[in-house]
């Protein structure tokens, strides 16, 4: 942007980029999540991270939720052997829980977070690309600026109020790659807290919608 006086020199809609094969097409599935978020503490316009983490990792229904996520992966993946995915989690503990659960059920996975060393991140990326692991479960990283074209599955494992974050995370799977026909997106949607504003979090003005 510095070369253009901090102005966009050009832009393209998401739909046009996909049609022109600049980005990968995607299939989006909203998957029912039986976890009830109605009683999770609401703080500063969002769910309390600790309470949400506890619900996803230590509650009675934590294993049941992880099992349903694994089933959805199997159901919506064209071939489980070819899956190379990123799962976006609410916390380090949640990412570690998901990776551990998948490893126990023969879906090799790694958890990464903002404290992970660069060599660990680079190693995880290589393993995902080569198929040595199926998933990277992450929090606070990989939202943007990460290039792993091989990613063909994206899991939204926590609610978000931010359209920007949602699009950034979706974008991790939109790069073109050899043998990659489309991206599979699984968004796990639960019963929300009554204060959760679906429209407010994802409302875009007319100009933004037109640019997509």
Q: Which residues fall in each region the model found?
A:
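Post-DEXD/H (motif II) to motif III coupling segment of the RecA-like Helicase ATP-binding lobe
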Residues: 1-29
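Non-catalytic, charged low-complexity extensions flanking SF2 helicase motor domains
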Residues: 205-212
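Conserved helicase ATPase core of P-loop NTP-dependent helicases/translocases
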Residues: 86, 95-143
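Short, basic/glycine-rich phosphate-binding loops at helix/coil junctions
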Residues: 34-55
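Conserved nucleotide-binding/hydrolysis micro-motifs of P-loop NTPases
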Residues: 1, 16-19, 32-37, 93, ...
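Conserved segment of the helicase C-terminal RecA-like domain
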Residues: 162-168, 172-204
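SF2 helicase motor core recognition
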Residues: 21, 136-154, 170-175
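Conserved strand-helix element at the start of the C-terminal RecA-like helicase core
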Residues: 55-103
């Amino acid at each position: 942007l510095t070369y253009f006086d901090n102005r966009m020199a050009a832009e393209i809609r998401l739909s046009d980029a996909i049609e022109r094969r600049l980005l990968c097409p995607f299939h989006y599935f909203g998957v029912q999540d039986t976890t009830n978020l109605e009683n999770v503490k609401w703080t500063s316009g969002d769910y309390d991270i600790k309470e949400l983490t506890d619900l996803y990792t230590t509650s009675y229904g934590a294993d049941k939720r992880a099992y349903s996520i694994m089933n959805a992966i199997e159901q919506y993946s064209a071939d489980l052997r070819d899956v190379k995915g990123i799962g976006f989690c609410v916390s380090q503990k949640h990412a570690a829980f998901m990776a551990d659960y998948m490893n126990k059920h023969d879906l090799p996975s790694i958890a990464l977070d903002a404290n992970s060393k660069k060599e660990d991140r680079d190693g995880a990326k290589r393993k995902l690309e080569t198929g040595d692991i199926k998933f990277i479960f992450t929090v606070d990283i990989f939202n943007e600026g990460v290039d792993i074209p091989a990613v063909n599955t994206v899991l939204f494992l926590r609610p978000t109020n931010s359209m920007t974050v949602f699009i950034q995370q979706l974008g991790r799977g939109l790069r073109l790659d050899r043998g990659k026909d489309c991206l599979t997106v699984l968004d796990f949607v639960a019963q929300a807290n009554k204060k959760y504003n679906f429209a407010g979090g994802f409302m875009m003005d007319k100009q933004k919608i037109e640019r997509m």
